[in-house]
Amino acid sequence: MSNGAFDAIFEYAWGQIDKPISGDFIYGKDLPKLIEIIENIFQKAQKSGSYELRLPLFSEINKDLFRTFSNTKTFFKIHKEEFDDIFFNLVNHPLREILENAFIGVDSIPSDFIVSMNLNSPSKFLVENKSKNTEGAGISTSRKKLTESPIKLLSRNNIGKALEVQVEELKRELTAKQSLLQENERQVSELKIRLETYQEKYASIQQRFSDLQKARQVEDNQNSSRTSDPGSPLVTGIDQKAILEEFRRRLQRQTDTISFLKDQIRRERGLNCSNDKVSHSKRKHATTDGDGTFKNFISAVPSNIWVKATIRIIVCFALLAGVLPYIRKYVYAHDTPSQNSRLQLSWWENSGILSKIVWFFEDQTDLETEYRSNANVDDAYSRVFGI
């Protein structure tokens, strides 16, 4: 293994960034640029075809670590003596090992590699730096040991650990996102399968619904044709049963109503039955002789004349009622009633005209009373039969 070849490559890349005015350090923001210069040297060697190399030298994760360090430690001073430790803390491998493993079939960097890439003629700055480093090697080493504090060493370790933690977190996030993506893909596939199943079910249900609609339409058409036929047994049976049932129901209701009204009329008229018989016998006995004459008289006289005559008769009757008692004393003073007579008549019942007038007014009074008593019954009967 040639330490001189590695030192030449490193010094060449370092000299591209480190300026004479800045001393022997670079800033943290220059670390990705330093790595890029080293990688360009090997890419150029591969293009020339002189060597078989494993490229790229650094993985994308390592490059992300370099960029993270440059962003978080922008103005952090990286001294040349501290570079190996910082680099090892970042990628867990020394830079020398990475460069040596890049060559296929060779365990170390070939010595002619430096000559082929023109890396053995260092710049003026490199010569000056080497002379300074050679002259003051002992002084700088002793000074470094004296000035390097435990806090600085601790900060180096903390930087490496922080970067490792960040790398682990990024790996975990990547794994979680990949798992989530796989789960989403699985759910999408399941949803597609369910959607296809529902579409098939919907198509079958729609087909069944259309078949049921067609069957119902056919059934409705058959029922309508049967109903429209007046001679069909179904229509005839329904009509006859409905008509007969309704007729019987109404007839029974009317029969019950008529029977109730008859019973009520009989009860109301039965109270005056005996009085009607007595009055009828009296009227029949007294008015037998003048019955025909009075009927002819009533039919011959107009209604207006009859009203006037009635009023005059009432007045005359009132006068006669006051005079006749005195006349009766003298006319019937010596008459004694017959012992065989079964019915004793009043004095006015012996006269055909007077008895007819009295019985007429009594009949009118009885009819009015009976009409008033049966008014409610007649109204109910009229409402029932719609008269």
Curated annotation (Swiss-Prot):
Compartments (UniProt record): Nucleus membrane; Cytoplasm, Cytoskeleton, Microtubule organizing center, Spindle pole body
Similarity comment text for this entry: Belongs to the MPS2 family.
Listed name of the protein: Monopolar spindle protein 2
Regions crossing the membrane: 311-327
One GO cellular component term noted in the UniProt record for this chain: nuclear membrane
One of the Pfam families matching this protein, by short name: MPS2
GO-annotated biological processes: protein localization to spindle pole body; spindle pole body duplication
Physiological role: Component of the spindle pole body (SPB) required for insertion of the nascent SPB into the nuclear envelope and for the proper execution of spindle pole body (SPB) duplication.
Compositionally biased residues, Polar residues: 220-230
Coiled coil: 157-269
Quaternary structure (record): Interacts with BBP1, MPS3, and SPC24.
Highest taxon in the source lineage: Eukaryota
Residue pairs linked by disulfide bridges in the UniProt entry: none
Membrane topology: Single-pass membrane protein
The keyword Ion transport appears for this protein: no
Keyword field: Coiled coil, Cytoplasm, Cytoskeleton, Membrane, Nucleus, Transmembrane, Transmembrane helix
Positions of the UniProt region annotated as Disordered: 216-235
